[in-house]
Amino acid sequence: MPRLFLFHLLGVCLLLNQFSRAVAAKWMDDVIKACGRELVRAQIAICGKSTLGKRSLNQEDAPLKPRPAAEIVPSLINQDTETINMMSEFVANLPQELKLTLSERQPALSELQQHVPVLKDSNLSFEEFKKIIRKRQSEATDSSPSELRSLGLDTHSRRKRQLYMTLSNKCCHIGCTKKSLAKFC
């Protein structure tokens, strides 16, 4: 008798679990119409709920398998070295005018001291180097954004912002689904 009761209780729990999944899927298809701060609050709430749902579904579908630390560390080091190599090649290939306009502020002493090993190999003194940097920064003009755009450095973030802006206009005037907002989490 208790065994039969436990099987019935298990069946009820499984049915309730399936019902909550169906409700969660339907919840993402709800249409909301919000503007400004209300839209931002809705976005935060949707991202919080959708990431919790993704996390619980991922844990049910595939439990986390511990990976050895030796496997993780070399890949991170390789990624870092690739990034550093790419950035150093990029900085070396920048036109001289763009190098001058990247920073218009006065250099801090710690930034100038980073170049001291370079100065040891050259005939320039530290004070002369500092004067050259200040002179070039004072001559700089602000033409770098167009040159950065032509190099393709800001296309991804700008494209994502433009998509979000069109979505926010749509959510404000027409309405949008929670699923479409969850894509930006």
Curated annotation (Swiss-Prot):
Residues 56-157 form a propeptide. GO terms for molecular function: hormone activity. Pfam families: Insulin. Its main location: secreted. GO terms for cellular component: extracellular region. Disulfide bonds join C35-C172, C47-C185, C171-C176. Keywords: Cleavage on pair of basic residues, Disulfide bond, Hormone, Secreted, Signal. It is found in: Secreted. Residues 1-24 form the signal peptide. InterPro entries: Insulin-like, Insulin-like_sf, Insulin_CS, Relaxin, Repro_Hormone_Insulin-like. Belongs to the insulin family. Relaxin is an ovarian hormone that acts with estrogen to produce dilatation of the birth canal in many mammals. May be involved in remodeling of connective tissues during pregnancy, promoting growth of pubic ligaments and ripening of the cervix. Heterodimer of a B chain and an A chain linked by two disulfide bonds. This is Prorelaxin. It comes from Macaca mulatta. The gene is RLN.
